[in-house]
Amino acid sequence: MLHRYLPMTEEDKKEMLQTIGVQTIDELFSDIPESVRFKGDLKIKEAKSEPELLKELSQMASKNANLKEYASFLGAGVYDHYAPVIVDHVISRSEFYTAYTPYQPEISQGELQAIFEFQTMICELTGMDVANSSMYDGGTALAEAAMLAAGHTRKKKILVSSAVHPESRAVLETYAKGQHLEVVEINHKDGVTDLDVLQSEVDDTVACVIVQYPNFFGQVEKLADIEKIVHQQKSLFIVSSNPLSLGALTPPGKFGADIVIGDAQPFGIPTQFGGPHCGYFATTKAFMRKIPGRLVGQTVDSDGKRGFVLTLQAREQHIRRDKATSNICSNQALNALAASVAMTALGKQGVKEMARQNISKAQYAKRQFEAKGFTVTFAGPFFNEFVVDCKRPVKEVNDALLQKNIIGGYDLGRDYKEHENHMLVAVTELRTKEEIDTLVNEMGAIQ
């Protein structure tokens, strides 16, 4: 009888050794010097039964701070939002439970229709013409947008606002290094991109300008002013945007953005260390044949019935590797489905209401902080995040808050030396008045 987890008998081992022409395991590894081979027994615990293992793992997991027991004011790209119950039900169905797009799309019409609906909803939110089937995360989508711009314009310089998420900028740097592109950061002023600096840097060598809306500090960038500067030199205008915010803010497409990218995590995708997330990538018809990743199109079959296909596949590396628009040859189909189900369950009015609640609750929190004597660093309009001056190390504040079952905001000093002791506070629709008041009061007591 085979072991449940180790399905190899001694006979199996003998047969495998005979097949490759050796007599023993030691002979198989004879090329490895004796001096570096491990000898003796591994110092690991004895095997446990399933009930024992489950109990031990549960005890370990209980040490984590989870969002069922803690009120989270931590955002910075990953947010604690409401996910309709139906999301988990739908994505758990066996027909959908895969992260991959099919290579024989005609046999997976349901999967392709779900992706098509995702693309459609992203276009509606962003005000763009076409969206792909998703990307790994927001950082990947941003870097891919920059690569598209560099390839299209044949220019080598990329301007990115320092108010763009630091981790997305790090991904961009990695991509750019391999392509021998120059990345220039544009400083922020009063929490938004410094337009004077931007104006001085934009010239005929610039492939694109990248800003975030709302930006990393939660501030709403002046896209209309930025667009005028960017397009003077025929550079591409790339906007990274929180899709939920577009339920309340004017979409970037209305401001003349050439590419809109971001992370769909606010829609139905839980907070989890390291992902997975779901990047989105939307653009205009002018760049439809240069967009990276999968594209699902709607068509009609020989019987006149509606059908869905993977279209424009010649762009992709599994078709023409040497001429592919991107090395991305996959997507986040399962998380894209989760985002689609969440948006569908909420509906247009639900998305708008969810965005409105984020704004109103964040505004309430800001007023409470100010009433308690805290300085809210930036005075401009914001969505659901704002910066508070803690007057002391943010880590100390957050350690104290954890004792009160509160997950505090992001420590901006990790990425911006000039913002040391400043906390980025995120307030979503899930936070209650009582939780907000407790946060402010506890931080006031720590001052």
UniProtKB/Swiss-Prot annotation:
What's a single GO MF annotation on this record? glycine dehydrogenase (decarboxylating) activity
- What chemistry does it catalyse, as a reaction equation? N(6)-[(R)-lipoyl]-L-lysyl-[glycine-cleavage complex H protein] + glycine + H(+) = N(6)-[(R)-S(8)-aminomethyldihydrolipoyl]-L-lysyl-[glycine-cleavage complex H protein] + CO2
Q: What is its EC number?
A: 1.4.4.2
Task: Extract the Pfam families matched here.
Answer: GDC-P (PF02347)
Q: Which domain of life is it from?
A: Bacteria
**Stored Gene3D superfamilies:** Aspartate Aminotransferase, domain 1 (3.90.1150.10), Type I PLP-dependent aspartate aminotransferase-like (Major domain) (3.40.640.10)
Name a single GO biological process.
nucleoside metabolic process
Keyword list (alphabetical) reads: Oxidoreductase
SUPFAM superfamilies registered for this protein in UniProt: PLP-dependent transferases
Q: Matching HAMAP family, A to Z?
A: GcvPA
NCBIfam families in the cross-refs: PRK00451.1
- Membership in a protein family: Belongs to the GcvP family. N-terminal subunit subfamily.
Q: Which PANTHER family match?
A: GLYCINE CLEAVAGE SYSTEM P-PROTEIN, GLYCINE DEHYDROGENASE (DECARBOXYLATING)
Annotated function: The glycine cleavage system catalyzes the degradation of glycine. The P protein binds the alpha-amino group of glycine through its pyridoxal phosphate cofactor; CO(2) is released and the remaining methylamine moiety is then transferred to the lipoamide cofactor of the H protein.
According to the record's subunit comment, the protein's assembly and interactions are: The glycine cleavage system is composed of four proteins: P, T, L and H. In this organism, the P 'protein' is a heterodimer of two subunits.
* Name of the featured protein: Probable glycine dehydrogenase (decarboxylating) subunit 1
Which species does this protein come from? Bacillus anthracis
